[in-house]
From Swiss-Prot:
The lineage of its organism: Archaea, Thermoproteota, Thermoprotei, Sulfolobales, Sulfolobaceae. Disulfide bonds: none annotated. One of its GO terms (molecular function) is structural constituent of ribosome. NCBIfam families: L13_A_E, PRK06394.1. One of its GO terms (biological process) is translation. Part of the 50S ribosomal subunit. Pfam families: Ribosomal_L13. GO terms for cellular component: cytosolic large ribosomal subunit. This protein is one of the early assembly proteins of the 50S ribosomal subunit, although it is not seen to bind rRNA by itself. It is important during the early stages of 50S assembly. HAMAP family: Ribosomal_uL13. This is Large ribosomal subunit protein uL13. Keywords: Ribonucleoprotein, Ribosomal protein. InterPro entries: Ribosomal_uL13, Ribosomal_uL13_bac-type, Ribosomal_uL13_CS, Ribosomal_uL13_euk/arc, Ribosomal_uL13_sf. It comes from Sulfolobus acidocaldarius (strain ATCC 33909 / DSM 639 / JCM 8929 / NBRC 15157 / NCIMB 11770). It comes from the Archaea.
Length: 148
């Protein structure tokens, strides 16, 4: 990588999480650093009950080695939900781990990123949806991640 890496700031407000994540994964694969701001305002399409059921499905699963101590770790806060979604779209090898380190997500807009130009993806806008949806912040509250 060059000494002057290109930084891309993505505003996740009213962006569909899956579609936004595909664009972020492509940017990361091209060697850019990506900062996602307003991660809690991203949108997941589908009725609230179905989305919650899908995310909470693996909370009760235990491992065979020590079922009392370990289970499958699932993200509960908005930052980790967004990062985990992008991680699933990256290569599953050493290169994928290195690429994943160039991704940062924030709740709100941090002071050092205020006033800088942010990009939004037109094909990931919530106006595409005709049905129901839930925000990542609302999902996080229902999973026990946000205390508001």
């Amino acid at each position: 990588m060059s000494s002057q890496e290109e930084i891309v700031i993505v505003d996740a407000t009213n962006q569909i999480l899956g579609r936004m994540s595909t664009h972020i994964a492509k940017l990361l694969k091209s060697g850019k650093k990506v900062y996602v701001v307003n991660a809690e305002k991203a949108i997941i399409s589908g009725p609230r009950s179905r989305v919650l059921e899908g995310y909470s499905l693996l909370f009760t699963v235990k491992t065979m080695q020590n079922p009392y101590r370990q289970g499958i770790r699932r993200p509960r806060n908005p930052i980790n939900i967004v990062k985990r979604t992008v991680r699933g779209m990256l290569p599953k090898n050493k290169l994928g781990k290195q690429i994943y380190r160039n991704l940062k997500a924030y709740i709100g807009i941090p002071k050092e990123l205020e006033g800088k130009s942010m990009i939004r993806f037109d094909d990931a806008d919530v106006s595409r949806l005709k049905g129901k949806y839930i925000t990542v912040a609302e999902l996080s509250r229902l999973l026990g991640g946000l205390k508001q």
